[in-house]
A protein has these predicted regions:
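Early extracytoplasmic/lumenal segment of secretory-pathway proteins
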Residues: 17-33
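Short loop/turn segments at beta->alpha junctions
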Residues: 27, 137-138, 157, 267
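Acidic helix N-cap motif at the loop->helix transition within catalytic regions
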Residues: 1
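An extracytoplasmic/periplasmic, membrane-proximal ligand-sensing/linker region
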Residues: 170-172, 176-177, 194, 202-204, ...
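Ligand-binding clamshell of periplasmic/extracellular solute-binding protein-like
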Residues: 4, 26-29, 43-56, 75-78, ...
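A ligand-binding cleft/hinge motif common to bilobed small-molecule-binding domains
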Residues: 51-63, 116, 120-125, 153-202
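Hinge/capping helix and adjacent helix->loop/strand transition within the periplasmic-binding protein
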Residues: 7-15, 34-45, 54-148, 152, ...
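Generic structural signal for residues in well-ordered beta-strands
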Residues: 18-20, 130-132, 263
């Protein structure tokens, strides 16, 4: 957020000042509720909301927002989730994982987080022998558990893997076996130097594909920026233009590279269309998705 805001202001008419306000709580639910229901509609509020909101809206229900009605201005990067396994498992690809006799033990923070959802879905839909242990306070704790042998796998954002455990990737201590999102990244290789498969492409039928698309929505929406519903269209368009200009700004890209930030931009129209498609997932399939996770 800080990096984008620092450069975004240069492209907004009048070059206004930005004040960052953090609003933690409920896994992003508090901030989403504020932006959707309380924040002024005059264009003076810009939000970077949780990428989990589309999935939460369907899987949790009873939320105080509708992601399809937000005014998106763009996405700075995807949150492509990559499933990694520790080198001692001997697993170097998804095919190896399918043949593994010992379960791959994944560390996770909570049952509503992607580091729990992704490996759970891989076990249920792909038939992999996995066990997911939830309760770790965060990524650092799971990484420590990997080093200590408590767990043998973790699903996490590719950007997080690179910034926090890039040395493990280079040394081969962790091996990528799958990626989750709506688009495949050819840069993510398995232990054999091959592109890791996109989970969405492994769906056996249309229903499975729709369910996997729902679970991949957080990766697709990624690090997105939006404005409340009801903001005048002219102001939204101005912000969309400013955001697009920022994403190609040489100073911004150099700053992002210095901070080891992956930039994979998408325009406001793409985000709006994606959010609407996700929210339109048929209720019977949402029910099946909840059942896969063991949610009542």
């Amino acid at each position: 957020s800080r990096t984008v805001m620092k450069h975004l202001v240069k492209h907004i008419p009048g070059k206004p000042n930005f004040i960052l306000q953090f609003m933690p709580g409920g896994g992003g639910q508090k901030a989403a509720g504020y932006v959707y229901n309380v924040a002024p509609r005059n264009g003076a509020r810009l939000a970077k909301l949780s990428n989990m909101l589309p999935a939460f809206q369907l899987l949790r229900g009873n939320v105080k927002y509708d992601v399809s009605k937000l005014n998106y201005i763009g996405r700075a990067a995807s949150m492509q989730y990559v499933t990694m396994v520790w080198h001692t498992t001997g697993v170097k690809s998804l095919k190896d994982a399918a043949k593994a006799k010992k379960p791959i033990i994944f560390g996770a923070s909570g049952v509503s987080q992607s580091n729990y959802i992704v490996p759970t879905v891989m076990g249920k839909l792909l038939g992999l022998n996995v066990k997911v242990v939830a309760g770790y306070p965060g990524t650092a704790a799971i990484n420590k558990a990997l080093e200590q042998g408590e767990v043998t796998g973790r699903a996490g954002a590719w950007s997080s893997w690179i910034s926090k455990a890039g040395h493990w990737i280079k040394s081969g201590q962790v091996v990528a076996i799958a990626q989750s999102g709506l688009e495949k990244s050819g840069d993510i290789k398995n232990g054999y130097g091959q592109a890791t498969p996109l989970l969405l492409d492994l769906a056996k039928n249309d229903d499975e594909r729709a369910i996997l698309k729902l679970f991949a929505s957080d990766a697709a929406v990624g690090r997105n920026f939006s404005m409340p519903p009801g903001v005048p269209k002219a102001r939204v368009k101005a912000m969309c233009r400013a955001f697009d200009a920022t994403m190609t700004d040489k100073a911004f890209l150099a700053d992002a590279k210095k901070r080891k930030l992956i930039i994979e931009p998408k325009p406001c129209e793409w985000l709006s269309k994606t959010a609407a498609e996700i929210v339109a997932t048929p209720k019977p399939l949402v029910k099946k998705a909840r059942a896969l996770l063991g949610w009542k």
